[in-house]
Amino acid sequence: MEHTYQYAWVIPLLPLPVILSMGFGLFLIPIATKNFRRIWAFPSVLLLSIAMVFSVQLSIQQINGSSIYQYLWSWTINNDFSLEFGYLIDPLTSIMLMLITTVGILVLIYSDGYMSHDEGYLRFFIYISFFNISMLGLVTSSNLIQIYFFWELVGMCSYLLIGFWFTRPIAASACQKAFVTNRIGDFGLLLGILGFFWITGSLEFRDLFQTANNWIPNNGTTSLLTTLCAFLLFLGAVAKSAQFPLHVWLPDAMEGPTPISALIHAATMVAAGIFLLARLLPLFISLPLIMTFISLVGTITLFLGATLALAQRDIKRTLAYSTMSQLGYMMLALGIGSYQAALFHLITHAYSKALLFLGSGSIIHSMEPLVGYSPDKSQNMALMGGLRKYIPITRTAFLWGTLSICGIPPLACFWSKDEILSNSWLYSPFFGIIASFTAGLTAFYMFRIYLLTFDGYFRFHFQNYSSTKEGSLYSISLWGNRIPKGVSKDFVLSTTKSEVYFFSQNISISKGQGNTRNRIESFSTSFGSKNVFTYPHETGNTMLFPLLILLLFTFFIGFIGIPFDNETMDNGIAGVTILSKWLIPSINFTQESSNSSINSYEFITNAISSVSLVILGLFIAYIFYGSAYSFFQNLDLQNSFYKGSPKKNFFYQVKKKIYSWSYNRGYIDIFYSRLFTLGIRGLTELTEFFDKGVIDGITNGVGLASFCIGEEIKYVGGGRISSYLFFFLCYVSVFLFFFLS
């Protein structure tokens, strides 16, 4: 066992030889390296698999009751200061190692098929392998300096992958947006690290936690500087994990390739912020004000993310807002001290969300040959529908992933989300109400994605394309009926003859339909050329295999949080779980063990209430977006409901406001653009005017005045010495007159 821990430092370095080999190959033999580029996927997967084997062994040892191991190498700068580097193996590290390696392997396999025809195939594998190295180094770091170093590497890799297709202006802009937004959090993290070093004189977790224990007897009463430094550390996690108000970069990050979206949302970029808070939770627990602030930010984020996902038309952006909301649940759990529930949800959400993102990539991959390679079309749910007939394997995997995120038992996310909801109700009814209501919203917008993508008819055949702006924008009504008048007409989905609102399932097909599955029709692309298309088809085995493996994780990973100690269950208290055995040292450290047990009756009651909210959300989504909408439309119920003046109808106005709020991202991006972008631009223009008009004006004015005076004076003397003597005596006389008087 000791032997395994001694060589644990190898885990982050295992993927490095492949990166170096690809780099040297591109430098020395570029043509051969590019011609045989797909062979590099095998060593990438192989070495990360070896890292996974090491991680599994470490995790098993942690579950069996091993203690925390830390190895340090000291780098002495002078007699008074030494900088230590090393690695830390504890339950949190082992969980993150398992998560990163398993999801990373599946994403690498998936990427081999998804990126096979991309010119940047090798560059993508270099970036993604280095991404895995950075995250593995982050979770094994033994002090704050190492965390910050790998924190920056994780950010750098994410920026490179978000802007992978940098020739597209939108992707380049998304990369810049992610960079600038995360700079705010990273700067706060750096200041917080330096502040705690100034307070405690150490950057080691052990020393920080020992100092924090001294604050607890004082009822958390600490200096303002300590609270400020803790807030700055939290600011880093806010930006990295896309929490309000620094969440704006996450939806735009979907401009990167879909495999990296899965990795960012499951196991790397956004998980880094949650990991940082979990690692430093013993420090934050001693600061009640910061803990309350963390829970408040998490609550705002989980609700905001759910509301912003309600009316999005881009499938990946909707999933991005879903990730933002689920990260809010984890942040809320950490803020109320529910350490185990937060990590449990981090695990279950990672596999379910990776399944959904890779499933969306399979959908996009099947749509691109038909609609083109523009994300506005291939990712637009307005052009999908009825895909269950054409990509059944993807549809099955996506459905189970959707139900898991919604919280349907016995899928993975049900167990973790239900634990967070129970703990939030125990901590504060305010947090419990918002978290429970958001669970219903989650079911609504997630099932909306599924219905718009797989239910009904394949709507692309009814869409008229043109090169005009009106023909290139599509949208989705929030409630399934006609777009409100307040929304721009550019967002209406229509055909050449009449408007077709695609959420209705009784769309009339053009005459001569026949066997439309085998029909080949022409359509006009945005380039104005005529082409032919068929229906979407299932992707290759290299893309389907990761979906099936993630589907198994979605089914069974939740059981690590289910009690298996029958004797304890007989006493009416929740028994020991695999996760609780895994986290025993950490739970003891955060003093959560007494709060994590819950009566069996309470568990069943809470589960029934949460599942009822989820079923209600699913039912409402089915009413507005499923086959049931056609039934209600045929009954003319909606027309009778709006028979009065619809503009004066309260429901109509609320619906329009919600749609506008959600579709426009809560107007937060617009607010930031006007406040910061336009404000800073105006400030720079004012500064430029002051610099050129005032500062340069004074300097240039003095020079110009001297020049003009000199030009006038030079004609006075005329070159005669008598004139010079005359003026000299006159000036001396005047000077003496004023001086003597």
UniProtKB/Swiss-Prot annotation:
The keyword Nucleus does not apply. The chain crosses the membrane at residues 9-29, 39-59, 89-109, 125-145, 147-167, 184-204, 216-238, 258-278, 280-300, 327-347, 354-374, 396-416, 425-445, 544-564, 612-632, 721-741. The keyword Amino-acid biosynthesis does not apply. GO terms for cellular component: chloroplast thylakoid membrane. Its EC number is 7.1.1.-. It catalyses: a plastoquinone + NADH + (n+1) H(+)(in) = a plastoquinol + NAD(+) + n H(+)(out); a plastoquinone + NADPH + (n+1) H(+)(in) = a plastoquinol + NADP(+) + n H(+)(out). Disulfide bonds: none annotated. It is a multi-pass membrane protein. It comes from the Eukaryota. One of its GO terms (molecular function) is NADH dehydrogenase (ubiquinone) activity. NDH is composed of at least 16 different subunits, 5 of which are encoded in the nucleus. NDH shuttles electrons from NAD(P)H:plastoquinone, via FMN and iron-sulfur (Fe-S) centers, to quinones in the photosynthetic chain and possibly in a chloroplast respiratory chain. The immediate electron acceptor for the enzyme in this species is believed to be plastoquinone. Couples the redox reaction to proton translocation, and thus conserves the redox energy in a proton gradient. Belongs to the complex I subunit 5 family. This is NAD(P)H-quinone oxidoreductase subunit 5, chloroplastic. It comes from Brachypodium distachyon (Purple false brome). The gene is ndhF.
